[in-house]
Amino acid sequence: METFLFTSESVNEGHPDKLCDQVSDAILDACLEQDPESKVACETCTKTNMVMVFGEITTKATVDYEKIVRDTCRGIGFVSADVGLDADNCKVLVNIEQQSPDIAQGVHGHLTKKPEEIGAGDQGHMFGYATDETPELMPLTHVLATKLGAKLTEVRKNKTCPWLRPDGKTQVTVEYKNDNGAMVPIRVHTVLISTQHDETVTNDQIAQDLKEHVIKPVIPAKYLDENTIFHLNPSGRFVIGGPHGDAGLTGRKIIIDTYGGWGAHGGGAFSGKDPTKVDRSGAYIVRQAAKSVVASGLARRCIVQVSYAIGVAEPLSVFVDTYKTGTIPDKDILVLIKENFDFRPGMMSINLDLLRGGNYRYQKTAAYGHFGRDDPDFTWETVKVLKPKA
């Protein structure tokens, strides 16, 4: 049997880049909660003892940016300098201006356009992907790497492993076979975890706890065998982490946010962007389209691309490829997609309820992936049943 290896990585919520994504989306949540028409393009950067938020926001909401920054960092677990950042004593810098009036008139006509008329906030192309290899219809490498990261945070916060600190990275290599275009996982080849820890714990204790409390509950036993390789904190020491260890920026983890290197990516990041930014809303709707194709039994694996021009409502192109796994021709699947999904930005906002913020709605997306999540707030994960015409 001919097989191949494929690898996906993840980082958990204490990684400095992910801290920035969460701050940007916490600010988006706060704006949309009070004013669903908020136009938000919020970037965050961080380094030792400092978090800065900057960008363009036009909103009627009253938002305490500094409080949101501190609350978000504290919620992650950055409560003292020795864990990488002290949420209550770090410097918070804010440099936020209004959205450019040139962009405003072209995209939403200074809020005068009807939903079906609202143009894309920028040019770009986005991809959605789905595969039948997991119940989530997501790649197994990505699902396992992401769940390992989430479990690391869980056992840190519930004190199962009190030596854990917020920063951490995971990576999973899976051996696959190609079944006429569909991906079939055979086994987990390698598991890599690098996690921040306190000064007191030994490397043996780290390895033992990670195997028992993180790997065992996450990776199904059927995928592990005596040949599975484990690299657990292979550098030997990871005490300094978070923004103290390295700088962080919003939008630096776009593959972790999506499909772990499978499918394709148009390059646009998600966090800190309101739904007129098609980098986000366009990527969400093509995930729904690709997932619906696979869930409806029309293909075992599917990728969908959409593209836009700034200020233009209708997409420039829509593309689908089922990697030769389709039960009907791709051209017929494309017709079904165009009939069932409205790719105009204003209509995506309505159909996926994307103008609703608050209650951590977008902040939740900013760690552990935007896709394959079982949460009603992730409206783009709802399957539309696609029926080919008789």
UniProtKB/Swiss-Prot annotation:
GO cellular component, one term: cytosol
Residues annotated to bind Mg(2+): 9
Residues given in the record as ATP binding sites: 15, 167-169, 235-238, 246, 252-253, 269, 273, 277
UniProt xrefs under InterPro entries: ADOMET_SYNTHASE_CS, S-AdoMet_synt_C, S-AdoMet_synt_central, S-AdoMet_synt_N, S-AdoMet_synthetase, S-AdoMet_synthetase_sfam
Domain of life: Eukaryota
The protein's required cofactors: Mn(2+); Mg(2+); Co(2+); K(+)
Listed pathway(s): Amino-acid biosynthesis; S-adenosyl-L-methionine biosynthesis; S-adenosyl-L-methionine from L-methionine: step 1/1
Enzyme Commission code(s) on record: 2.5.1.6
Organ and tissue specificity: Mostly expressed in stems and leaves.
Main localisation: cytoplasm
GO term, biological process aspect, one: one-carbon metabolic process
Swiss-Prot/TrEMBL keywords: ATP-binding, Cobalt, Cytoplasm, Magnesium, Metal-binding, Nucleotide-binding, One-carbon metabolism, Potassium, Transferase
GO terms assigned for molecular function: ATP binding; metal ion binding; methionine adenosyltransferase activity
Annotated residues for binding of L-methionine: 56, 99, 246, 277
Gene induction: By salt stress, ABA, and mannitol in roots. Repressed in leaves by the same treatments.
Cellular compartment(s): Cytoplasm
The keyword Nucleotide-binding belongs to this UniProt entry's keyword annotation: yes
Lipoprotein keyword on record: no
Free-text comment on the cofactor: Binds 2 divalent ions per subunit. The metal ions interact primarily with the substrate. Can utilize magnesium, manganese or cobalt (in vitro).
Reactions performed catalytically: L-methionine + ATP + H2O = S-adenosyl-L-methionine + phosphate + diphosphate
Residues where K(+) binds: 43
Family, per entry: Belongs to the AdoMet synthase family.
NCBIfam families in alphabetical order: metK
Function: Catalyzes the formation of S-adenosylmethionine from methionine and ATP. The reaction comprises two steps that are both catalyzed by the same enzyme: formation of S-adenosylmethionine (AdoMet) and triphosphate, and subsequent hydrolysis of the triphosphate.
Assembly and binders: Homotetramer.
The protein, known as: S-adenosylmethionine synthase 3
Gene expressing this chain: SAM3
